Amino acid sequence: MKSKLKRQLPAMVIVCLLMICVTGCWSSREIEDLGLTFAIAIDKGKETNTEKELKEEGGSYPKKDNITLTYQFVNEKAAGAGTSGGGGSGQGAQKAYINISETGDSLQQIGSEVALRRDREVFSPHLKVVVMSEDVLHTFPIDEMLDQFFRDNEIRLSCLVLSAKGEARDALQLKENGEIPAFRLIGLGENEHKVSRILPPMTLAKLIGKLHSGSSFLLQNVVAANGAVKYSGAAVINGKSKKMIGTLNEYETEGITWIRGEGKGGVVKSHDKKSQQTLAYDINKIKSRIQPIVKGKDISFHVDIESEGDLVENWNTKEALDTQFIDRLETTIENEVKKIVGQVLKKIQHDYKADVAGFDESFRLTYPHLWKRVKNNWDDTFSKADITYSVNVTITHFGTVKTQ
C-alpha cells in the first residue's frame, strides 16, 4: 500500500500544482482599472480642439495627420451611478460613455497616445463595432486600414464593421444619457426580421475572407444626425483596389436582399394599378436561386425569386378579397420587386462593375473549372453578362379581415 502511494505521490503533486495555477488570479486585472473600449470610429485626419490645445502645451509627437480615431469607453463614474443600465436619463445625468479622439498615422501609436490621456488601461477585448467614414474608405485600402485590428490578439473577430456617411465619430453620439452608442449600432442590425434593407453583419472574420478572395463586397452604412443614428444603404468596396467606389441607397440595398434570398422579413409597399390605393406586403419568406448559363464564350444568369407573405395593409376597401383581386395584388407586388431588383442590377453591373450580389459564388459552384479562368477578372466578366430574373409572390394571409 505504501509503495502504491509512493508511486502516485508525484502525480498528486502535479495535479495540485495545476489546480493552483488554474484557479489562481496571478495575471487578472480588476475591471475597475480597465478602460473598456466598445467602439472605434475612423475618420480622415483632423485634430480636435482638445488635441490642438494639448499640442500648444507641448503634448505632441512626430506624426502625419492621416487619420483620426475616436475611442468609445464606458464612463465608469456613470456606470457606478447605475446609468449604463438604462437609468439616469435626466438632464443632469452623466452619459454612459466617453469618446476620446486622437490623430496620427499609425493606429497602434494612436492607441498609445490615447493611453497618455486616460487613467485606465485601454482594453479592447470587448470592442463591438468599428465605424469607418466614406472619406477614409475612398482614400485608403480597407485591408491596410484594418491591418492592426486583424493582428491585435485582444480584438475579437466577431467585431462588426460599418461605413458611415459624413464623420464616423458622429455615429458614436446619442442624445440619451443612459445608453452606449456601440450597443445601439449592434441592436439596429438585430431588426433584420422586420426590415429587408439590413445586410447580414460584416464582422472582422467575414471581412478577412472577403479580402483574401478578392471579391467585391458591401458594408452596411449608417447615417447620424443630431444624436440619432440609422442604418441606411451600403458602401460598395471594390475587390481589387480594396477601396470604396460608390454607395447603394436603401431601396437598392433591399434589391440585394431579394437577389441573394437572405431576407428574414420586411415590407414591400406598392399601389394597386386599378384603384391607385396603397397596399403593403409583409415578407415571411424569400427564396432565390441564381442560375449561371454558359453557351460557348457567353456567360449569362437567370435569377428565380419566390416569396410568401401577408397582406397587412390595403387602402382599397371597396373591392372584395376574391381570387381575381388577390391575383392582381400579387402581380402588383411582383412588379414592385422586379423594379427594385432591376434598379440595383443596373447600378452594380453597369455603373460600378462590381458583383456584390453573389453571382460569383453561384458560378464557382456550378462551373468550378471555368471559374479558375475567369476569377481574376470576375467583376469585368460580371459586368458583361446578360441577367434575367423572374419573381413569384404568394399572399398566404390577409390579416383579420374576412374575404367577402
UniProtKB/Swiss-Prot annotation:
<comment type="function">
    <text>May be involved in spore germination.</text>
</comment>
<keyword id="KW-0564">Palmitate</keyword>
<keyword id="KW-0309">Germination</keyword>
<comment type="similarity">
    <text>Belongs to the GerABKC lipoprotein family.</text>
</comment>
<dbReference type="InterPro" id="IPR046953">
    <property type="entry name" value="Spore_GerAC-like_C"/>
</dbReference>
<keyword id="KW-0449">Lipoprotein</keyword>
<feature type="signal peptide">
    <location>
        <begin position="1"/>
        <end position="24"/>
    </location>
</feature>
<keyword id="KW-0472">Membrane</keyword>
<dbReference type="GO" id="GO:0005886">
    <property type="term" value="C:plasma membrane"/>
</dbReference>
<protein>
    <recommendedName>
        <fullName>Spore germination protein YndF</fullName>
    </recommendedName>
</protein>
<dbReference type="InterPro" id="IPR038501">
    <property type="entry name" value="Spore_GerAC_C_sf"/>
</dbReference>
<dbReference type="InterPro" id="IPR008844">
    <property type="entry name" value="Spore_GerAC-like"/>
</dbReference>
<dbReference type="Pfam" id="PF05504">
    <property type="entry name" value="Spore_GerAC"/>
</dbReference>
<dbReference type="Pfam" id="PF25198">
    <property type="entry name" value="Spore_GerAC_N"/>
</dbReference>
<feature type="lipid moiety-binding region" description="S-diacylglycerol cysteine">
    <location>
        <position position="25"/>
    </location>
</feature>
<keyword id="KW-0732">Signal</keyword>
<keyword id="KW-1003">Cell membrane</keyword>
<feature type="lipid moiety-binding region" description="N-palmitoyl cysteine">
    <location>
        <position position="25"/>
    </location>
</feature>
<dbReference type="GO" id="GO:0009847">
    <property type="term" value="P:spore germination"/>
</dbReference>
